Amino acid sequence: MASMISAEKRNPAIVILDFGSQYSELIARRIRETEVYSLVMSYTTSADKLRSLKPKGIILSGGPGSVYEEGAPYCDPEIFNLGIPVLGVCYGMQLMVHELGGSVKPATGKAEYGKAPLEVDDPTALLTNVISGSTMWMSHGDSVQKLPKGFVRLAHTSNTLEAAIALHDKSFYGVQFHPEVVHSTHGMVVIRNFVYDICSCEPDWTTNLFIDEAVSQVQQQVGDKKVLLALSGGVDSSTLAFLLNKAIGPQLTCMFIDQGFMRKGEPEFLMSFFDEKFKINVEYINARERFISQLKGVTDPEQKRKIIGREFIRVFEEESLRLGPFDYLAQGTLYPDVIESSGTNIDPKTGERIAVKIKSHHNVGGLPKDLQFKLVEPLRRLFKDEVRKVGKSLGLPDEIVRRHPFPGPGLAIRILGEVTHEKLNCLRDADLIVREEINNAGLYNKIWQAFAVLLPVYSVGVMGDQRTYAWPIVVRCVSSEDGMTADWSRLPYAVLEKISNRIVNEVEGVNRVVLDITSKPPGTIEWE
């Protein structure tokens, strides 16, 4: 990785023009995995803007449109006169063909979706070291009917004659498949060929370089002013705390609001870690009773979220006034927050998609609009996996770097129905057992999330020849790459048995354990 400053001051080596593809962000991530800096920008970005950025390559993303339909998204045609290598992916390839004099029509046979063997006709340039017959991921209903003058075929599939094409003398390339998705077995080979062999990029997107430049940028931006950070204990805010502490030290104040819905031992661990071990200035705000009292009698999940969000804002306002004044508010905004999926928020100056709101603090609601802070967002050009690498390099322990995603409202939305002290204690104990056994089995880092849910019903059971009526606990473990989709994790029966036995024997008030085997979609990862 390079740095957030690279994003702000250094030009990207590769620009991805986004035509509405669900994979545009993934293309950027894959390029960064090759240690080359990339940015996603709107397809409306002008050729003049791109010329000023001086990228070494341009990628035209896929998209849901058809180039021959009215209203289809088109890029500035002058892009093809910049003398910069271009790679069109799926819709991007069709657009390039259409713009340069070829033709695109609905697929004559049938649309091609899913895995397809790629037959390589010309194993040079873009397809160097791509094995003929390797699997590539297809997702298109249109196909190229006629190539523009000078273009040649590089590969085909059984349903797509022009699966990869090239205009070698201008370094224009197109692929009908998606090299960025994990199902394309040689997709990264294609991406590396374009980035290094065709665009002649240098590997300069490294973690250490990011840290050095980000520290310098924060120091320049902040000067001798004071910065406030709302610390949740998640990987984003924790990494940001370490980075800012390295940059400005005592000018940073972290506010940790304990709303009473964290997992067992977490508040104590976070305070001992940040405040005592690393001497980062953390103000601990114990608001447990305040939050739970507001939830008395509340069973609707949306109401719970709104109440927790409202109270967080009130506590944040009160405490920032007490601890301040502060000049800057630090936020753990990440690049996916900047890349708005709707594509409607376009910066007219840069052509980039932009976030238009202050990021909600760990999903519990936006911060007050009238807080007069300037923003410090040094992570805003990083993806989640890049943040983990930065955190690791800064010295964050695996307990935080590899911490599973945790909802802002915490255990309050893993207790269905009303939240009480008794239910919280019960769920904390059960949740700890789930995580302990997953960790003992060496599975923690292989699973996206693993947690327990408490149901607001009584289940009949028998313990010691006595009939019992107690709560059931749901075990929820899912595998995912980004949380957008997820599948339930196939845990070994022995691990499930240990989890079940320990919960019913060690957790008071529970007599049954069930396993949630619902994928997302149709379900969500959380129950509320």
Swiss-Prot record:
Catalysed reaction, written as an equation: XMP + L-glutamine + ATP + H2O = GMP + L-glutamate + AMP + diphosphate + 2 H(+)
Enzyme class: ligase
Pathway this chain belongs to: Purine metabolism; GMP biosynthesis; GMP from XMP (L-Gln route): step 1/1
A GO CC term attached to the entry: cytosol
EC number from the UniProt entry: 6.3.5.2
Key words, A-Z: ATP-binding, Glutamine amidotransferase, GMP biosynthesis, Ligase, Nucleotide-binding, Purine biosynthesis
InterPro entries: Class_I_gatase-like (IPR029062), GATASE (IPR017926), GMP_synth_C (IPR001674), GMP_synth_GATase (IPR004739), GMP_synthase (IPR022955), GMPS_ATP_PPase_dom (IPR025777), NAD/GMP_synthase (IPR022310), Rossmann-like_a/b/a_fold (IPR014729)
Residues forming the catalytic site: C90, H178, E180
GO molecular function: ATP binding; GMP synthase activity
GMPS ATP-PPase domain sequence ranges: 205-403
Binding site for ATP: S232, G233, G234, V235, D236, S237, S238
Function per UniProt: Catalyzes the synthesis of GMP from XMP.
Subunit-structure text: Homodimer.
NCBIfam families attached to this UniProt entry: guaA_Cterm (TIGR00884), guaA_Nterm (TIGR00888), PRK00074.1 (NF000848)
Protein name as annotated: GMP synthase [glutamine-hydrolyzing]
High-level lineage: Bacteria, Bacillati, Cyanobacteriota, Cyanophyceae, Synechococcales
